[in-house]
């Protein structure tokens, strides 16, 4: 798990820098004063690093089990006092008020959704971000490797629910 989180620890600063999300706003607000919504947090690979950058991180996922693991992961490797979670029960609606976040972020998540759900989540990302906020969403198209990667991903995710394997991961 530590090595898995370390990949997020190295990627998050790079993405935040590339997307201009590490600089103060025009009003001088720093990230530690802002709220980031992460769509598709999984077990918290990137969430840990986000909690070290932002004052509040709302980790959203379709899988309630992943949200539980995300809390555990951030408890070990991030700042859990900055973490909130939100269950995306229907797969496309964020249970968050409009204009409630400074940044919405999603990476390697939307390709796992149906096209309609991905578009609705993109609209939700815009809905929850404040005027002047930023939306950073990653869309990945299908690839030939998906024949192997998609079933392997399902298998790995299913092992998170097996206590002896899930705890080991």
Language-model features, listed with the residues they occupy:
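Class I (Rossmann-like) S-adenosyl-L-methionine-dependent methyltransferase catalytic domain
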Residues: 1-33, 43-93, 113-120, 134-169
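Residues that mark the start of a beta-strand
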Residues: 34-35, 130
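Structural signature of beta-strand start/N-cap positions in the alpha/beta core
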Residues: 35, 56, 100-102
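Class I SAM-dependent methyltransferase core
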Residues: 38
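A short acidic, Gly/Pro-enriched loop at the edge of an enzyme's catalytic core
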Residues: 92-104
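A short SAM/SAH-binding and catalytic strip from SAM-dependent methyltransferases
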Residues: 103-116
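A short glycine-rich, Lys/Arg-flanked "PGG" loop and its adjoining helix->strand segment in the class I
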Residues: 119-131
């Amino acid at each position: 798990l530590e090595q898995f989180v370390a990949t997020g620890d190295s990627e998050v600063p790079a993405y935040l820098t590339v997307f201009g999300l590490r600089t103060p706003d025009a009003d001088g607000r720093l990230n530690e004063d802002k709220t980031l919504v992460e769509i598709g947090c999984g077990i918290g690979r990137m969430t840990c690093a986000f909690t070290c950058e932002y004052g509040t991180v709302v980790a959203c996922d379709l899988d309630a089990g992943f949200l539980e693991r995300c809390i555990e992961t951030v408890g070990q490797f991030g700042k859990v006092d900055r973490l909130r979670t939100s269950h995306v029960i229907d797969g496309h609606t964020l249970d968050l008020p409009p204009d409630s976040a400074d940044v919405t972020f999603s990476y390697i998540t939307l390709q796992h959704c149906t096209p309609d759900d991905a578009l609705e989540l993109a609209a939700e990302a815009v809905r929850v971000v404040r005027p002047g906020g930023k939306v950073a969403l990653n869309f990945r198209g299908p690839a030939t490797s998906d024949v192997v990667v998609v079933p392997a991903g399902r298998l790995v995710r299913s092992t998170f629910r097996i206590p002896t394997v899930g705890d080991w991961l």
